[in-house]
């Protein structure tokens, strides 16, 4: 809400506001009348009829022909053709590979390359065999170690079983044997020497 300025000032402002509103209302009514009268005087063109074509018309049923491109324009490779990598040339550039016209020299080169590849394959096979032998040897060593452990384990088991069965008999017999074989020792007398 707006702050109140006082009773006298509000009365004056109301009077001036009423004068302004009455003058503005007459102007507004005139402008309203003039606009509406202008609209009545202006003639509108009659509405045009828009004719729609039936969908069954032949022109709509016909499909527009699209342009068909040839294989050369699309730069498509020929189908069912296996071309070696060296033969394929990139567009607009020369390939740096030169092929031999003589068939025999071509075959010798091929034989050399194949021999190298076979050698590599053979070396891989040899390495695989060596690795397999190493694995087999390690496996055997591990098995031997496990057998030794089992053997030691079984021995200790047997020893413990024997000790349990015999109990204190063996220990007492050993003590008796030790005492009978060695004469009893005399206790050493302590001597003190004066300088």
Curated annotation (Swiss-Prot):
Q: Which GO terms describe its biological process?
A: intracellular mRNA localization; mRNA transport; ribosomal large subunit biogenesis
Keywords (alphabetical) are: Coiled coil, mRNA transport, Nucleus, Ribosome biogenesis, Transport
**Record's compositionally biased regions (Basic and acidic residues):** 46-60, 136-159, 167-178
Annotated GO molecular function terms are:
mRNA binding
Family matches, as InterPro entries: Loc1
Q: Which family does it belong to?
A: Belongs to the LOC1 family.
Known role:
Required for efficient assembly and nuclear export of the 60S ribosomal subunit.
Protein name from the UniProt record: 60S ribosomal subunit assembly/export protein LOC1
What organism does the UniProt record list as the source? Coccidioides immitis (strain RS) (Valley fever fungus)
Originating gene: LOC1
